[in-house]
Amino acid sequence: MAPLNSQAAGEEESNYQCRFPRFMHLSWKRPYLTRVFDLAVIQKKQKKEMSDSEEKKCNDDSKQPVLVLDLLRSILERLSFVDFHRGRCISLEWYSASESCLAVKNPTSPWIILFPSENVESKNDSCKLYNPRDHSSYIVRDLGFDLARSRCLASSGSWFLMLDHRTDFHILNLFTRVRIPLPPLESTGDGNVFKRVYENVSDGSCIKIDNAVLWVDEKRRDYLVVWNISRLFGYHKKGDENYSWKVFKPLKKNDCCIDMAFKENKLYVLSVTRKVTVYDFSGGDSPVKCATFPSLRFRNGYSYNTQGCHYKVAVTLSGEVLIIVAKVEPYPRVECFFAVYKMDHNSSGYERISLGGEALLLDLGITVEANCMKNCIYFSNDQFHRYNGKSLCDDSNKNGICVYHIRSRYVVQVFEHLTASSKIAFKDARSFFPIFGGKWLL
């Protein structure tokens, strides 16, 4: 990584393009400590390129000074989020020092990821990340597959469940570039075969996986994927002997799933009857039904029209089950209505509530402790209009990434600037937490 000269620095107004092998292209102000970090990266690269004989002759590790952990921590704590996680990859010493900094460096507010629309002229394998805490944006390039013709179905930390334009699944970590292949959609294991009838579909939009959840435990190197089509549920765990999806059909013939969430080994399924059923995946091969919540019934005198509303399920920090009634009209300006209901165990009905000091991430189906955006809902228009083929840059969808305040009933933040000046057309946006809890080794 060549140092910037003064002329180049002046032309770029103290911003630069960081080019690290197979990593990120981003812009930020370059502090002195980043130069120290870059030097360490260069030294590692040079060391790797040396032959074994040259290394023994020119660089005896036992005679080289090793930075003490306190100094490494001091450097890591002053690096940007992306540089911090690049630094973890330099050596075992850097990785060990970073472990004590993870609680500081893991974000406490959700990031936003934007996925590209298909570009007919060239393959597009870039996506955009946005950190609202310091208003920094990153472009992730060279992911090694056609991202524009794939669709993100769910996320867990820094991991994303992707379905390509055929019927192939994989789990992707954007930061480490680890990809875990999953069984294809046809492999359901019990004769429920989905044929590859969408070979010429451009972006996977005709493969309508209704809902999906992803759970990844980096420390235990474990994962679970569950997807749903109508009444059919498919799931796959790490270590399953058969390379296929296990299937179960828990809903009645005239019922189907409209949303689901996952937390602490439990799958929360919201059906079209607005009933929530909970399935426990912590046991053996098959999930076990462990709880049922009655249908959401509106009491007399509710003050809004439910026609055209969407229904979502979520789980709070304390484990309470929520049903969210949502109505979003993106054009000509964002008009939203959200109502959050919680089960009232005393009356066996639902009561309308606020979130207090928590915030709701509809993409993840969970609430989190909120530092600033309290009693708010993070959502994107695409959640309610997926598979419509529209770009987030379209006039009818450009205000597609929003934060809604429950008490005031207004959209209090719109991230229009993420798409307004971009040369890339984005088809989807999601909130996620880029958490690094351990080193994933396959």
UniProtKB/Swiss-Prot annotation:
One Pfam family matching this protein: Beta-prop_KIB1-4
Domain F-box: from-to ranges: 62-109
Location in or out of the cell: Cytoplasm; Nucleus, Nucleolus; Nucleus
Keywords tagged on the record: Brassinosteroid signaling pathway, Cytoplasm, Nucleus, Repeat, Ubl conjugation pathway
Consequence of gene loss (knockout): Abolished brassinosteroid (BR)-induced ASK7/BIN2/SK21 degradation, and BR-insensitivity. Suppression of the constitutive BR-response phenotype in the dominant mutant bzr1-1D, and accumulation of phosphorylated BZR1.
Placement of sequence motif Nuclear localization signal: 236-243
InterPro entries membership: F-box_BR-signaling, KIB1-4_b-propeller
GO CC annotations on file: cytoplasm; nucleolus
UniProt keyword Calcium, yes or no: no
GO biological process entries: brassinosteroid mediated signaling pathway; positive regulation of brassinosteroid mediated signaling pathway; ubiquitin-dependent protein catabolic process
Main location: cytoplasm
Assembly information from the UniProt record: Interacts with ASK7/BIN2/SK21.
Function: Component of SCF(ASK-cullin-F-box) E3 ubiquitin ligase complexes, which may mediate the ubiquitination and subsequent proteasomal degradation of target proteins. Required for brassinosteroid (BR) signal transduction. Mediates ASK7/BIN2/SK21 inactivation both by competing with substrate binding (e.g. BZR1) and by promoting its ubiquitination and subsequent proteasomal degradation.
Protein name per Swiss-Prot or TrEMBL: F-box protein KIB2
Lineage: Eukaryota, Viridiplantae, Streptophyta, Embryophyta, Tracheophyta
